[in-house]
């Protein structure tokens, strides 16, 4: 008997066993009830729908599924990407959070940007500052802190100078074409 014929018999036996256990004793909690098929339906219905394996409706978020095709995943990913770019481009008084809450500026309807698809958005943005502002606004809309995105002035140049000195010392080593010959002279650990 091959595995395709064994599976329905096994499911039927499990269903019958569950029926007998329920008749002998009351249910022992949610673990038994959630792992077994519904006792009111026929075994054939349970084998076809397998409702006990599917995601419970009360836990399901809108638009989410457990079993989803690759094409559907791609479509949803493109849809989410479009929604993100639309929300990042949505006019707000202070997309970068640079003004205090009470001092946000209003945008006029003539200056509001019209949402465009992501590929066209990259082509139409010629100004690098506009690109940077767009990326910063998008990152902030995703919850990245403003302090992380906008660099602070250096408190001390000592660290920067020490790093530059270190790079200057090792520059001849890395620029030298005989790097392999130099490494062969070093003792191996």
UniProtKB/Swiss-Prot annotation:
Kindly report the protein's main subcellular placement as a broad class: cytoplasm
Which domain of life, per UniProt?
Answer: Eukaryota
Keywords from the named record = Cytoplasm, Cytoplasmic vesicle
Where is it found, in Gene Ontology cellular component terms? acrosomal vesicle; cytoplasm
Q: Please list where the region (Disordered) is annotated.
A: 1-120
Protein's cellular compartments: Cytoplasm; Cytoplasmic vesicle, Secretory vesicle, Acrosome
- Basic and acidic residues composition bias: which ranges? 70-87
Describe tissue expression. Mainly expressed in spermatocytes and spermatids in testis.
Q: Where is the composition biased (Low complexity)?
A: 14-24, 103-114
The protein here is known as Testis-expressed protein 22
Q: Which organism is it from?
A: Mus musculus (Mouse)
Record gene name? Tex22
